[in-house]
């Protein structure tokens, strides 16, 4: 399923997203995060030791809710982890997100030895207001 133009617009803007994955016991885990898109996938940059990535390795289902400035400007994407990207591309991507969200040339937090990973999220269903 391709991404709706509203999803692309919200993901390309400096809008925060809530990412929901499933813990091993089935409980949902929600985290607030930066989000991006390449036009085909939603992109979330994380660290490989984080719980959300562990959850996705076990169960690839994920929901991403992106909120705009207006409370009626949002998109919910229910989907699955389609692929991951690591290495220098993931490090460059977190720097890109730092510029987009906090106007910093590089990501302001230390990057651990595990590095960064981009989660490429494919949409299975998109819900929009209205």
Language model features by range: what are they?
Residues 6-9, 32, 108:
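Short, flexible, glycine/charge-rich loop motifs used to bind or transfer phosphoryl groups or to couple energy/partner
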Residues 1-16:
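Extreme N-terminal tail/first-helix region
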Residues 2, 71-130:
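Charged, gly/pro-rich active-site loop segments
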Residues 14-47, 63-66, 76:
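Short beta-strand segments
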Residues 50-52:
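Short, surface-exposed beta-strand-loop junctions and turns on beta-sheet-rich folds
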Residues 29, 60, 115:
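Exposed loop/turn and edge beta-strand positions of beta-sandwich/beta-sheet ligand-binding modules
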């Amino acid at each position: 399923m391709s991404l709706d133009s509203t999803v692309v617009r919200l993901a390309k803007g400096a809008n925060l997203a809530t990412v929901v994955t499933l813990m091993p016991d089935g409980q949902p885990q929600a985290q607030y995060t930066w989000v991006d898109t390449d036009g085909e996938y939603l992109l979330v940059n994380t660290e490989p030791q984080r719980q959300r990535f562990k959850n996705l390795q076990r169960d690839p289902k994920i929901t991403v809710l992106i909120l705009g400035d207006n409370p009626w400007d949002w998109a919910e994407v229910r989907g699955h982890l389609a692929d991951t990207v690591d290495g220098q591309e993931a490090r460059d991507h977190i720097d890109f997100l730092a510029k987009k969200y906090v106007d910093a040339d590089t990501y302001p937090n230390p990057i651990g030895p595990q590095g960064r990973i981009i989660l490429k999220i494919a949409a299975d269903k998109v819900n929009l207001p209205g």
